[in-house]
Curated annotation (Swiss-Prot):
GO molecular function: DNA binding; structural molecule activity
Main localization (coarse): virion
Sorted UniProt keywords: Capsid protein, DNA-binding, Host nucleus, T=1 icosahedral capsid protein, Viral penetration into host nucleus, Virion, Virus entry into host cell
Organism: Sugarcane streak virus (isolate South Africa)
Motif Bipartite nuclear localization signal per record, residues: 1-28
Function, in words: Encapsidates the viral genome into characteristic twinned ('geminate') particles. Binds the genomic viral ssDNA and shuttles it into and out of the cell nucleus. Plays a role in protection of the genome from degradation, virus acquisition and transmission by insect vectors, infectivity, and systemic movement. The CP of monopartite geminiviruses is absolutely essential for virus movement.
Subcellular location: Virion; Host nucleus
Disordered: annotated span: 1-42
Gene Ontology terms describing biological process: symbiont entry into host cell; viral penetration into host nucleus
Family under the similarity heading: Belongs to the geminiviridae capsid protein family.
Xref: Pfam families: Gemini_coat
Protein name in UniProt: Capsid protein
Length: 248
């Protein structure tokens, strides 16, 4: 019994010495030497495509198809610095205005805007019917269009939106009689979309241009079509957030 009591005393004294020293067993300075260093990601590049004045986009019945991401080779922020680019985000801020010819009638139409990926560009910009083949009898109803079965391996719809425009038979220069007023209609509309998570990769040829003919693989188009034949013009900005990747 006395021996066992002495053993407990020694173990208690050892524990007190360990606690008073403040050193944790099994920990070394090497554990802290490999602490992670936070790295900041480089900012995305930005290209702004403006439609205003003489560069406004005219959208006739049947629609239009334009290239997004026309990155020419260069050193500016809006240029591609390598032969590969990746579009991550797109911000659309457009104002649609019905033409005077369309305003002469009283009508309502549902138009459509698409973002379309082209996996295998042919060197020439595609037409709307190349992507969405349809009979002429469905030209006024773009919400019924589908990607052609023969080209579904090439064209992929990334985003699709609809919008409504109205005209009431009056143009902007008309003046109502003093005894009446004309109710407003949606012949001028604001179209805003912010798209994330696109990840559209484009491989460019060994050229300096930024057109469809300079693309080897992967292109992004915007397709706009009016509903019920209500032609309009597009004013505003498309902003693309992208990166130049790969080798110089």
């Amino acid at each position: 019994m006395p021996l066992s009591g002495m053993k407990r005393k020694r173990s208690d004294e050892t524990g007190r010495r360990k606690r008073s020293s403040g050193v944790k067993q099994g920990r070394t300075s090497a554990a802290r030497a490999g602490s992670a260093v936070r790295r900041t990601r480089p900012s995305l590049q930005i290209q702004t495509l403006q439609a205003a004045g003489t560069s406004m986009i005219e959208v006739p019945s049947g629609g239009v198809c334009d290239l997004l991401g026309s990155f020419s080779r260069g050193s500016d922020e809006g240029n591609r610095h390598t032969n590969e680019t990746v579009i991550y985000k797109v911000a659309l801020d457009y104002h649609f205005i019905a033409t005077a010819a369309a305003c002469k009638y009283s009508s309502i139409g549902t138009g459509v805007v698409w973002l379309v990926y082209d996996a295998q560009p042919s060197g020439n910009p595609p037409t709307v019917k190349d992507i969405f083949p349809h009979p002429d009898t469905l030209t006024a109803f773009p919400y019924t269009w589908k990607v052609g079965r023969e080209v579904c391996h090439r064209f992929v719809v990334k985003r699709r939106w609809t919008f409504t425009m109205e005209v009431n038979g009056r143009i902007g220069s008309d003046i109502p009689p003093s005894t009446s007023c004309w109710p407003p209609c949606r012949k001028n509309i604001y179209f805003h979309k912010f798209v994330t998570g696109l990840g559209v990769k484009t491989e460019w040829k060994n050229t300096t241009g930024g057109e469809v003919g300079d693309i080897k693989k992967g292109a992004l188009y915007i397709v706009i079509a009016p509903g019920n034949g209500l032609d309009f013009t597009v004013h505003g900005n498309a902003r693309l957030y992208f990166k130049s990747v790969g080798n110089q």
